[in-house]
Design a protein with these regions (language model features):
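A nucleotide-sugar donor-handling region in carbohydrate enzymes
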Residues: 1-54
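Active-site regions of enzymes building and remodeling cell-envelope glycoconjugates
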Residues: 16-27, 87-96, 147-149
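Short loop/helix-cap segments at secondary-structure boundaries that form the rim of catalytic
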Residues: 10-19, 81-90, 121
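A donor-sugar binding/catalytic signature common to diverse glycosyltransferases
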Residues: 97-141
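Donor-nucleotide binding loops and adjacent catalytic segments primarily
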Residues: 33-108
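Hydrophobic/aromatic beta-strand patches that form the interior of the parallel beta-sheet core
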Residues: 5-8, 19-21, 76, 91-93, ...
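C-terminal alpha-helical cap of glycosyltransferases
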Residues: 158-162, 171-192
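Nucleotide-sugar donor-binding patch of glycosyltransferase catalytic domains
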Residues: 91, 123-163
Length: 192
């Protein structure tokens, strides 16, 4: 039997039984101030998120290179389980299961161009820079949609300083709400 609906968490046009509800992003009940306290962020904070593999190590290397220009800020790294090393003047949170909260607490996000991370930054209005893995077409497309290319890594310090001046602009992605409405309506119609 064909299913009633296929729910896809991306923007786009519905067709037949396919419902595109928009991104589904985790939410937090804590305020930004509570989260900053929870993570001990006391200065303006630049979050560097490199994903779960070593593919994003180039971002950390670049941040280490430009560190002297960023000395007045707190630099925090979120990485996969494979990167457990300690860095001087950089806080390495390692692997976290609440990246959305760390993104919300940060003042600027520097990240690979993964779709979920982009959506979480938009949800919480965190100014962000997305550098794709070179040759990874999906990340390159995602980054380009946000106005970035791999070569932007060469002006990362300049971009970070620009982004620190940007106002937060949260955008409720709404996907979870739309998906739950479709499911509730389906359950209600099958109970009658």
């Amino acid at each position: 039997k064909k299913c009633d609906y296929v729910i896809i968490p991306e923007d786009g046009v519905d067709e037949d039984n396919i419902r595109r509800v928009g991104p589904i992003v985790r939410k937090t009940k804590q305020s930004r101030e509570e989260l900053r306290e929870k993570f001990s962020f006391t200065k303006k904070t630049i979050l560097v998120a490199i994903g779960g593999t070593d593919a994003g190590l180039f971002l950390i290397e670049k941040v280490l290179e430009i560190l002297p220009k960023l000395s007045e800020f707190e630099i925090v790294i979120v990485s996969g389980p494979s990167l457990s090393k300690k860095f001087e003047k950089i806080k390495n949170l390692g692997f976290v299961n609440n990246l959305h909260e760390v993104i919300y607490a940060a003042d600027v996000l520097v990240s690979l161009a993964g779709k979920s991370t982009i959506d979480e930054a938009k949800q919480y209005g965190t100014p962000a820079i997305f550098i794709p893995i070179r040759g990874h077409f999906e990340q390159e497309d995602n980054a380009q949609e946000e106005g970035f290319v791999f070569e932007d890594i060469e002006r990362l310090d300049e971009l970070i300083l620009q982004k620190l001046e940007e106002k937060r602009n949260p955008h409720d992605m709404g996907g979870a709400q739309k998906a739950s409405e479709i499911i509730k309506n389906l359950l209600n119609s099958s109970n009658h």
